[in-house]
Amino acid sequence: MSCQQNQQQCQPPPKCPPKCTPKCPPKCPPKCLPQCPAPCSPAVSSCCGPISGGCCGPSSGGCCNSGAGGCCLSHHRPRLFHRRRHQSPDCCESEPSGGSGCCHSSGGCC
């Protein structure tokens, strides 16, 4: 035999892939999450409800005079001839749309 033939015979065999694939871990059954409670009402600082004393946060235009559930209207200020009304220029005494007394981010009533 020549040296070249001997070298070919002595080469290590190619690596074979393992016969068995690794077993997958057992799948866990999906766990039921506890049902979430109903979403909270808006923060007290954003509402003019009786509980908050009629106070709105600074982003909603200040405080209401009465705690009757009125809502701040920072962008609906009455004109000069409306200043004779008893309500504050930044607030409405009641919810005109029958809302909860909370203010929208834009300052209007719900």
Curated annotation (Swiss-Prot):
GO MF entry, a single one: identical protein binding
Tissue specificity field: Skin-specific. Expression was readily detected in adult trunk skin, adult arm skin, fetal skin, penal skin, vulva, esophagus and tongue. Not expressed in the cervix, rectum, lung, colon, or placenta.
Any GO BP: keratinization
Residue intervals passing through the bilayer: none
Coiled-coil ranges (or none): none
Chain intervals for the UniProt region annotation (Disordered): 1-22
InterPro entries given in the database record: LCE
Compositionally biased region (Pro residues): 11-22
Compositional bias annotation for Low complexity: 1-10
UniProt keyword terms in alphabetical order: Keratinization
UniProt xrefs under Pfam families: LCE
Induction text: By calcium and UVB.
Functional summary from the UniProt entry: Precursors of the cornified envelope of the stratum corneum.
Other observations noted: Belongs to the LCE cluster present on 1q21.
Similarity comment: Belongs to the LCE family.
Official protein name in the record: Late cornified envelope protein 2B
The species this protein was found in: Homo sapiens
